[in-house]
């Protein structure tokens, strides 16, 4: 019923001499998300890792994205389909959204895509029912174990699982944390929870852990950040909001997603306590490199 599709994008742009010189500071990142478009949360950091640090970014997508049809009105003319019709959407939207995801990923420098195609039946806040009754939890766990074993990652990015957020986001994060916790302690990557400013900032500021899931508890050190308004280019006239906005624009089926285009935003990362305190210093160093590496 479920299938795994691994697609490898080979960039036509060679690594810069600066990136090559910093190879010992070139992290390998696995991003675990629930839907196509969730990756935009980490847009600027992914871009800096892949383009300034010479690192790599892979993405494991848990759902098929079929539930994201309600605001697809404008995309209908582009794709020649009434994507607001549930049956039409569930037939065609998963493939369309994968193409949109990979178009945005080409901008950010995402290398590999692992599609787990779990059912996306629409929005709910109950992550436990998703894990118990909707997704094939055993299958997802096995695939995440495999990716982590073969990927030799330094860091895993997840959405910070705040309570009012979509249940799929929280469920994907829980499964990612549990997968890392099953690894030998000497081989574990550091797993982080991320959230950009400008959305539910008051809730994010109070977050300690998701009720009922102590594995999601975070250290209050940090957050460790990258400001999308960081200037670069001729006369410093460019900044990394452009990267996020370009990625958002690729998700044309997600009409309300377009309203998140902006001229500011800070990507923030917290360390889950299951990593141990040593992970705080390593995360601080990695994000310092993300902030300061020449472009």
What do the predicted segments below correspond to?
Residues 11-19:
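C-terminal segment of classical bacterial N-terminal signal peptides
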Residues 8, 59-61, 190-196:
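A generic structural motif
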Residues 20-151, 178:
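Active-site rim/loop-helix segments in enzyme catalytic domains that contact anionic ligands
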Residues 6, 40-42, 172:
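Hydrophobic side chains within alpha-helical segments
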Residues 4-12:
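Sec-dependent N-terminal signal peptides
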Residues 2-3, 20-32, 129-295:
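Metal-dependent de-N-acetylase/amidase catalytic core
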């Amino acid at each position: 019923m479920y299938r795994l599709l691994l697609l490898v994008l080979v960039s036509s742009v060679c690594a810069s001499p600066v990136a090559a010189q910093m190879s010992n500071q070139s992290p390998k990142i696995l991003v675990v998300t629930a839907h196509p478009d969730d990756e935009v949360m980490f847009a600027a950091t992914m871009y800096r890792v892949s383009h300034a640090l010479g690192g790599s970014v892979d993405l494991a997508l848990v759902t098929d994205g079929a539930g994201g049809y309600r605001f697809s009105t404008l995309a209908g003319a582009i794709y020649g389909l009434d994507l607001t019709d549930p049956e039409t959407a569930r037939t065609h939207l998963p493939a369309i959204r994968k193409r949109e995801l990979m178009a945005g990923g080409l901008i950010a420098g995402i290398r590999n895509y692992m599609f787990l195609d779990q059912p996306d039946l629409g929005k709910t806040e109950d992550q436990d029912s998703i894990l118990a009754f909707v997704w094939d939890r055993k299958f997802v766990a096995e695939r995440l174990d495999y990716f982590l074993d073969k990927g030799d990652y330094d860091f895993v990015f997840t959405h910070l699982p705040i309570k009012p957020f979509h249940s799929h986001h929280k469920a994907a994060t829980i499964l990612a944390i549990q997968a890392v916790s099953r690894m030998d302690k000497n081989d574990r990557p550091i797993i982080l929870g991320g959230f950009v400013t400008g959305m539910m900032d008051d809730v994010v500021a109070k977050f300690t852990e998701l009720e009922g899931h102590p594995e999601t508890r975070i250290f209050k050190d940090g957050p460790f950040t990258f400001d999308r308004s960081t200037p670069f280019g001729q006369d410093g006239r460019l900044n990394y909001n452009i990267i996020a906005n370009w990625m958002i624009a690729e998700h044309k089926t997600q009409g309300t997603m377009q309203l998140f285009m902006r001229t500011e935003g800070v990507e923030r990362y917290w360390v889950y306590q299951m990593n141990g305190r040593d992970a705080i210093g390593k995360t601080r160093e990695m994000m310092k490199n993300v902030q300061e590496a020449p472009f």
